[in-house]
């Protein structure tokens, strides 16, 4: 049913230029090749999945299928567009920003100018801490929950997102 698909009306714009890629680093917009270590992690993960079987238990099923997190990568980090339900509600209060994702209604809590959470604490969407650089909210996220590894990221995975109001 194509009614529900959210194709968008134009490609992404970055620094005033329309882009066909959401990657801004490297400048060519292409995903860098996997390192040897990443290729090995992918191979080991695939072997583990195959050895357990598709229905060995709930832990072998995707988080979205278990209604723990949104489908695709819309809840983030990083928050990337998917096929539909790409709307976000952003609410700011003293010390916090909350981003509510339309898809599955994930609520991402971002603390502003805060200290990191204890090392053992690993929320589903990671530990997001933000600060303002002028009109841009810069969000640094680390400590993703091991079950929510973004694209086979390691435990030391960190990501920086920048949110700027455009209108």
Give residue spans per PLM region.
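PEST-like low-complexity, intrinsically disordered acidic/proline/serine-rich tracts
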Residues: 1-167
